[in-house]
């Protein structure tokens, strides 16, 4: 009987963990699943002399800044979240939609001002799933309804959809939503060493949060509700791989131990080999016996276009060869804690 009770308790616990990761959409707009043109907010585009407003530019991924490269069109600008259009506007055209948390969590940051970030007024919520921290981010809000330290449940109103931040007007009002991994608790030291401008947002600056493909996760969970964020990360396509000195802090491995491939060394390895998605999401970490003195590129996917255009400018070159750019090296140092 005791064994049965323990088994039942374990099943209940696992069910709770899985259900906690079944994400809700942040607004009443649920058209993602059947009419994406009604879900994503459009972007203004001027390409080849034609001005258009494609909704596709509001999706996650390399969906902006089209350019002709040979006979193909490549999109070089990466968009790290989902831009969700409003369903309700008042007589003046201002959106009225409430923005809710996509899952249970704790508010860790609520921007005090709308003028200190491209995100405008934004909120970050921490979710602890399977022993790992994930951070959802809600940007361009007209107003905030929560404060840091506040516990929230899925659907709890965080704020009102708006158009704060740079480059957005009333007609393009939307909430920009991300689901991120956290890179470094020493972010402020890294930022101070690399930028002359002040960091107004502490460790919850967008540069310290790297997004997973939230759009794909929503669609996948629709078919398979038990799919977790960790599953989604591990299923992401590899973009490039970097060797990093073994004395790198590798905080990502402490926060996301499921990134480790193979066994964890007893001490510091000679080096680490870290696999990233094309946009820089850490996908795997493996200890190596080959000593290196500084981060360098060991592999990059040949996407048939210059690497710069499909790696957010982190890798230069083309074909099967490439190397980290200055921006790429700076990013890898942050992601791996080698600074």
Show the residue positions of the predicted features.
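N-terminal secretory signal peptides that target proteins for export/translocation
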Residues: 1-3
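Surface-exposed, glycine-biased beta-strand/turn segments
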Residues: 21-121, 163, 200-339
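Zn2+-dependent peptidoglycan hydrolase active-site motif and core
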Residues: 94-96, 100-143, 170-172, 176
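Surface-exposed strand-loop junctions at beta-sheet edges and helix termini
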Residues: 102, 146-147, 152
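Conserved, short, structured surface segments that act as functional micro-motifs
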Residues: 116-126, 150-224
